Amino acid sequence: MILSGLWRLTLLICLSAMLTACQPEKKSIAEWPHSAVGTLDAAISRDGRFALVSSVNFGAGYWDLEKNQLKFQWTHNDNPEDGIIAVNISPDGSRAITADKRTFIIWNTNSGKAYGYWEAPADIRAVAIANKGRYVLLGLGSGKAIHIDMNTGRRLEFTGHRNEAVASVDLSANGVWAFTGGNDYRAVLWNTKTGKPRHLFEHDTRVTQVKLGISGKKAFTSGTLGNATIWDIQSGAEISRLSLRPREYVISAASFSEDGGQLLTGAPGKDISLWDVSSGERLFRWTARTRKEGKPGGAIIYAVGFSEDGRHVLSESSAGYGEKWSLADARTN
């Protein structure tokens, strides 16, 4: 979920309730400090090897998680007011995108070099990038979503969110399908070649998170009151609803497993949960660390992902820490 910087930190913490685990608490097997002050947004590569972490006042760091090594430090300018509030890594891992309130930059993740600097027509709320950086999708505060062909410069404006802010976006690896969720209580899957919707998913609240499955067969949406649903993209039918308690308001991050059988989510209350896609039942829950251990504190989970070998879960939180968890915890529960 990508909203506006510090405002997002305050909003999500206020909306969330502190979650308590049903199972005995399992600690992470690795912990990495990625931000000294706090994190504004984060993304984890599909193979689980890298993380892109936007820090308060320090730009965005591209981290090698296997070595716990900062590979690149990227900034837009020297003005701390222009913080990087939205980030994403392409599915193939070759490109990354960072955005401040009105501009975005595409980066080569091998060399660290920038391809260019572009301006958006309105405030940026969310970003996504396709393989090799060929296509970019922007969710704007104006209610529009813009799909850009970075090779030809073609721009397609999608106006299907009734002038309400587009809070979350996702893009298929080939850039053909866009998935957008907005404050108009809608999530829309639409074709970027024609601009025509394929499926419209209505919600009872603002849509705060959308995510496409890796195989292109499933999708996930959630709102501000725990109405989290997994969908069949082919038919548009509901597969399952996550078994959330009424006070579990917001899901701030989501990622499907490679085979599409499991869903990983993150929430503002330090919560990382593993779900069964078919039933919507929670399989396990982990609790992320906070900045001040032993004292009351929260942590919004901004990114979650699976390791390439399928043995571990990865997370990045607003507390500035990346963590690694064992999936064996869920199997032995």
Range-by-range predicted roles:
Residues 2-7, 16-333:
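WD40-repeat beta-propeller superdomains and closely related acidic/aromatic-rich repeat-like regions
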